[in-house]
Amino acid sequence: MGCCCSSDYDEDWIENIDICEHCNYPIDPDSKRQQLIRNVSEVRDPLVSYEAMSPPCSPLQDKLVVALYDYEPTHDGDLGLKQGEKLRVLEESGEWWRAQSLTTGQEGLIPHNFVAMVNSLEPEPWFFKNLSRKNAEARLLASGNTHGSFLIRESETSKGSYSLSVRDFDQNQGETVKHYKIRNMDNGGYYISPRVTFSSLHELVEYYSSSSDGLCTRLGKPCRTQKPQKPWWQDEWEVPRESLKLVEKLGAGQFGEVWMGFYNGHTKVAIKNLKQGSMSPSAFLAEANLMKNLQHPRLVRLYAVVTKEPIYIITEYMEKGSLVDFLKTSEGIKLSINKLLDMAAQIAEGMAFIEAKNYIHRDLRAANILVSEALCCKIADFGLARLIEDNEYTAREGAKFPIKWTAPEAINYGTFTIKSDVWSFGILLTEIVTYGRIPYPGMTNPEVIQNLERGYRMPQPDNCPQELYELMMQCWKEQPEERPTFEYMKSVLEDFFTATEGQYQQQP
């Protein structure tokens, strides 16, 4: 079907692309319909049905997208992209969409996170579509951003409205983020202060980039963002060992080593190779098939496996490594209590998802939390502890058994539930606020067991807010059913400081 709009042809053309701006259909260069309709008798009421005329435009207009980044095809059937190239989406299925280039006419699969809707705000470097207030703060406070870095996001509470988030420096709080409501006008415009109104968000950004005019600071550069990693190719699950190249050893754990490497020479991944005999390959594959379906922004993504021993687990690569190690670095040791609690809230969010899926982690601690370049925390190794066939790990007397993180009922009776994960989360909170200190400092594992049986609980760490310590103590209730849910702890941690400060800055 071609363009069926009756409008000025010269104004309908997008530069270098034969697409009608009104209906998004291609305009046939040889078609007589390109000619300007001047004859009044040919003007037709669009609401009236006429016989012998071309079929009307589909009410579901084509979905046109623009490439945000270059993409080199690496698979059979995917389509290369050039930044700024426009495409028509033919089918949305999972993380790879079938599309047709409006430049070349070629069809193929494209990564959904490399494109954005044409004629929308999504291609703008300062616009972040689905971003919460907390995540906006985390992004803006991440390394690479400076005073005045900003973003505009969709409002969490008011559909169709937006919020402006700006990085600022406060004498009392240090680096902080200020939020401003962008209010909608009846005529379609926007304003932060009613003194100055704008017909578009682009105008608003341009204005406050040249003058703060009541904001905490003039807008600087848009919030830094990284080119996303393309989604894992849909058919690659059990992969040959030869497709992996181990490049840099990141660490060695109780069950094997972790490497940074590449899959098929182009996709950066983390590769965990398990010691032979540490678990049954068949049991691992069954568990891995469950794990790969647990997909959430706060869980490390499981990409693929090598199921012949030595078993390889291929996951997304997290630049900052484990949380316990990161907290001890020169960057980690400088994190404010606000940022530490934000990290705790992120972990609680991931565990709330695991809780909702009736799954159990079994080995929740800072060593099994990974940190991205933007300081986003993700939960790793969920479910693997159950498969370990090493008595040093599975027996409570074993040297590898994580006594200090394990709930009493799991130590004594091997009873692991989501409530034993809650206990472990309380211990993890102490690791976070002490910048990676080992729990129960100065105690051996047998001493920890004896003290727990007598009702001992760790004292409040230095610089730990009283309310946070009270949450820890709830996690360490003797009766598992009395411990809080992760969903509850997520809401408490996300709103920890919000209750005592304004949600938004006053109108300038």
UniProtKB/Swiss-Prot annotation:
One GO CC term, this protein: plasma membrane
Keywords: ATP-binding, Cell membrane, Cytoplasm, Kinase, Lipoprotein, Membrane, Myristate, Nucleotide-binding, Palmitate, Phosphoprotein, Proto-oncogene, SH2 domain, SH3 domain, Transferase, Tyrosine-protein kinase
Residue positions bearing lipid (N-myristoyl glycine): 2
GO molecular function, one term: protein serine/threonine phosphatase activity
Post-translational modification (record): Phosphorylated on Tyr-393, which increases enzymatic activity, this site is dephosphorylated by PTN22. Phosphorylated on Tyr-504, presumably by CSK, which decreases activity. Dephosphorylated by PTPRC/CD45. Dephosphorylation at Tyr-393 by PTPN2 negatively regulates T-cells differentiation.
All residue ranges annotated as the SH2 domain in the record: 126-223
Annotated active site: 363 (proton acceptor)
Xref: InterPro entries: Kinase-like_dom_sf (IPR011009), Lck_SH2 (IPR035850), Lck_SH3 (IPR035749), Non-receptor_tyrosine_kinases (IPR050198), Prot_kinase_dom (IPR000719), Protein_kinase_ATP_BS (IPR017441), Ser-Thr/Tyr_kinase_cat_dom (IPR001245), SH2 (IPR000980)
Subcellular location: Cell membrane; Cytoplasm, Cytosol
Ranges where the Protein kinase domain occurs: 244-497
Free-text activity regulation comment from the record: Inhibited by tyrosine phosphorylation.
Topology relative to the membrane: Lipid-anchor
GO BP, one annotated term: intracellular zinc ion homeostasis
Domain SH3: start-end pairs: 60-120
Modified residues (Phosphotyrosine): 393, 504
Keyword Glycosyltransferase: no
CDD domains in alphabetical order: PTKc_Lck_Blk (cd05067), SH2_Src_Lck (cd10362), SH3_Lck (cd12005)
EC number: 2.7.10.2
Lipidation (S-palmitoyl cysteine): 3, 5
Function: Tyrosine kinase that plays an essential role for the selection and maturation of developing T-cell in the thymus and in mature T-cell function. Is constitutively associated with the cytoplasmic portions of the CD4 and CD8 surface receptors and plays a key role in T-cell antigen receptor(TCR)-linked signal transduction pathways.
Binding partners and assembly: Binds to the cytoplasmic domain of cell surface receptors, such as CD4, CD8.
UniProt family annotation: Belongs to the protein kinase superfamily. Tyr protein kinase family. SRC subfamily.
Name of the featured protein: Proto-oncogene tyrosine-protein kinase LCK
Native species: Gallus gallus (Chicken)
Taxonomy of the source species: Eukaryota, Metazoa, Chordata, Craniata, Vertebrata
UniProt gene name: LCK
